[in-house]
Amino acid sequence: MNQNLILRIVGVILCIEALCMIPPLLLSVFGGGVDQRAFLYALLICGGVGVLLSLIRADNARLQTRDGFVCVALCWIALSVFGALPYFFSGSCSFIDAIFETVSGLTTTGASIFPSPASLPRGIQFWRALTQWMGGMGILVLMLALLPKLSEGSVNLMKAESPGPISTKLRPRTGETARILYRIYIALTVAEALLLRIAGLPLFDAITTALTTISTGGFSIRDASIAYYQSHLVNWILIFFMFAASVNFTLLYLCVTRRFREALKSEELRVYSLVVVGASAMIATDLIVRTGRDIGSAIENAAFQVTTLISTTGYCTEDFDLWPQFCRCILVLVMFFGGCAGSTAGGVKASRIVLLCKSLRRDLRRVMHSREVRPITLDGHRVTEETVSSVSVFFFAYIAIMLLGTLILSLDNIDFTAAFTASLTAISNVGPGLGAVGPTCNFGFLSGISKLTMSAIMLLGRLEIMPLLVLLMPSVWRRK
């Protein structure tokens, strides 16, 4: 294992995180916030450790696949620990709570321990939003965009951090691909912030909401989330950008370069769009029939909640935990389904669901026709058996971790619905669940063990399980 290079990369990542603490520090200084010292101390500690680690000399600049997984896992753990310092030093919460809030931010989950985000200092509010934006595209991708020559095995870093079963490179060089992804990411963020400002949101609200929408994070500076604004225009703007952020960024790049036909050929996009429209239609119909809602309100709220949960953003325009049981069941299913591979969304991912369904269909055909050889394809390209197998393993691990999390959370003596949806929302990086962890509640009541458990599950979900699990394998740490 290339330990020196891994530690050096961790140091560079911590330096980037320290630089990201400057905007909330300045906001606090010029706004007269009480959290000035918190950010100053956190910046000095994070930056100091980062500089020391980044000075480590690495004779070998090559990262193998194993090194890539270990590096990504250690970087995210370090980011979570040092990113928690502003919360802790500000006196807003305990260190375990600070870890939970930071992990929830970086993994774009959006579950919070704060009962009233609106009462937090401006610096902390902005830090919450910024951590989600940092984690949405991936801070290692940002590092590759800024410092593409830091490691010769940068493709292994990108593979380990990027979501989805099949990785797509937009350019031959990993650094070029990272820069294209971040240009799209920044452009979407700026466009949404401008539209929200035009729609009537205060500038600070527009910026923080844009940061947490494009990252599909869901943190809001308002206690009532998006319901606070009571604006149909804001709701539809958010629906559009939540959907865009949950689509494979490769397809967005094709649209930017006017290759619309190529983008529309995506099987995953067609399935994902069908699920969003279908789930919204079913919920809207049920709301109209069972609750007597008018058609406009039913369609808007159904579309918003389906899009926010399937994209794993986690905003709310109303308490969907009070909706009919059929609606709640559909919302739980879309939380599990998640967005598209190669997006900022969490969940199982539409491409994996498509591959699992095709694998099931092929195996059923083999029962009837044992000699038939039928390869699985996606977008007209043959999918290797190794990829199909990895999707099945991922799905099993996903379910197992979710059930284990439910079991551990039940030790807090909360009901099954709350424990199950809390575990689901953690591994899918959604945010709100049902019952005691519903959209109008927070996670502050959980015990320290449960908060650390959820933090681990959130990291497993964001890194798609394997990078963290490989840390538990003794063979990873043996020198070869």
Residue ranges of model-derived segments:
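Membrane-proximal intracellular helices of multi-pass ion channels
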Residues: 1-480
